[in-house]
Amino acid sequence: MSRAGASLYEVFNIKKPTTGQQTGIEGRVLSFNYYESIYSPMITARLMIEDTGGTIESENGVLGTIKDSMKITGFEEVSFKIVTGNGDLDFTDYPLIVTGSPATKDEPNRQTTVLNLVSKTEMISSSKPLSRNYPEAPISETVTKILNKELKISEDKLDIEKTQNQDKIKGNHLGALDCVLKMCKKSIPADYKDPGYFFFETQDGFKFKSINGLIDEGIKQFEDVDYEYEHTYYYFGALLANLDKNPDRDPNDYKVLLPPMVRRDEDQLQALRNGLYNVRIITKNALTGEYKEVIKNLLSDTNLGEKQQKPVTDEVYFKTYAFHINPGEDDPGVSDKILNNPANYVPQANMRYSLLHSQVVQIQVPCNVQLRAGQVIRLLLENITQGNKVEHVYNELRSGFYMICHLSHVFTPKNSYTSLTLLRDTRELYTSKK
C-alpha cells in the first residue's frame, strides 16, 4: 500500500449514546482530518461525510440522512480504525466525540455534513470543573493526581516528567485539563535547569513533558535503527533510489512532497528586545523590604542543533522583569515562606518557549501514523551548490533535528498524507554537547 495513496477505513461508526443508535459510514467519508499539537491537551478531528438519504431510519421509520435521522447535535461517538501503509490509526476503544456540525450543504439528492470532533476526555473535563484546591506538593505529583483521580485516566496512558519545584494548585472551577495546562509555565524539570513544559494528548495518551526533556528523549530515540528510519525525511528534487534493495521500504515514502515553507526564521533584533540572552530581574520582598537586582544569563544547554551562543556581554540587558514578593500569601496565619517564586521561572520560561520557536517550518509528507506531536524528526534538505554535490549532499545549516509542534493526518478517497509544523531552536545538522 502506497503511503501517499488511499487508506482503508476498516471501521468508521457513528453512535448516539442516548438511544444506542449506530451506523457505519465507511463508504460515505469524503475527508477526515486528524490533529495533534503540543499546545493542545486534546486530540481534535474534522469529518466530512456525504449522504443520499437512504442510510438510516428516523424515530418515525422514515429513511433519511445520518445528520437528520440520528439528530446529530453533539455528544455522539465516532469510532474508527484506518489502515495505512505503516500502521493503523485505531480509535475503536476510545471514540472521539462530536461537538457540533458547523457546516451542512443540502442538495436535491444528497447532503454534505462537516462534524467537529474532540477526545472524550476533553468533554469529561469541560463538564466537571474543579472546585477543590490541591495542597503544596511537587507539581508533577499533583498533575498525576488530577488526571488519574479526577478524569480516571489510567497510569499507562500518562507520561509525566518529574518536577523539582512545588506549588499549591487551585481548581478555580476550571476544567481539569485547563487546570493542568496553567501549570506548564511554572514547572521546572527535575533533571534540567530550564522551566517550561508542554501538556498535550497524542494517540498514545497524555504527556506532561519539559521542553528539554522532549528534545533529549527525541534525539536519543534515533539510537534505534527502526525509529531513525521512520523519523528521517528528505527533500530532494529527484526521486530517491532504494539503495538497500529492501522491497518493504521505499525511500520515497520519506520524501517531503512539497517545498518546505519557512514560517519564521531567526530575528536577532527581536531576540535582543525580548530578553532571549540576558535579562535584569528585580525582586522586592514585602515582608523584609529586601530589594534585589541581578542580570541573569538565560542560555539553554539543551538544543536541537548547535549550542546556543549569545552576541552580547554578560552585563548587557534589554529586558527587565520586576516581581513584588509576598511571603506566606498562600498560607493561613503568619508565614515567611516563599512558594514557587515567579522570579525563578517566568523569565526563564519565556526565554525557553521563545527560543524553541526561533525557526518554524511546515512540510507535507506521505501519511505516517507512527509520528506524534512532541517527537523529534530529522529533516535532510538538499544542498544548493555549484560545487561538489557528492561530498556536500545536505544543507548543513538548515538540515538536522526538528520538533513536531502540530501534526495533521489527512485522508481522502484518493490520498493520505501528513502535514507537520516543525520547531527548532538552533541551527546546524549535528548537535553539540560542548
Short names for language-model regions:
Residues 35-69, 227-434:
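An acidic/polar, Gly/Ser/Thr-rich interaction patch typically located in mid-to-C-terminal regions
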Residues 147-152, 184-189, 379:
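Sec-exported extracytoplasmic/periplasmic mature domains
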Residues 112-115, 119-121, 159-253, 258, ...:
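Short beta-strand-centered interaction patches in the first periplasmic/extracellular domains
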Residues 111-112, 118-122, 136-157:
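Glycine-rich, acidic and aromatic/proline-enriched surface loops and short helix-turn segments
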Residues 10, 28, 41-45, 92-94, ...:
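Envelope-exposed proteins and targeting segments
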Residues 1-127:
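Assembly/oligomerization scaffold segments
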Residues 127-136, 165-171, 360:
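Second-shell loop/turn segments in exported
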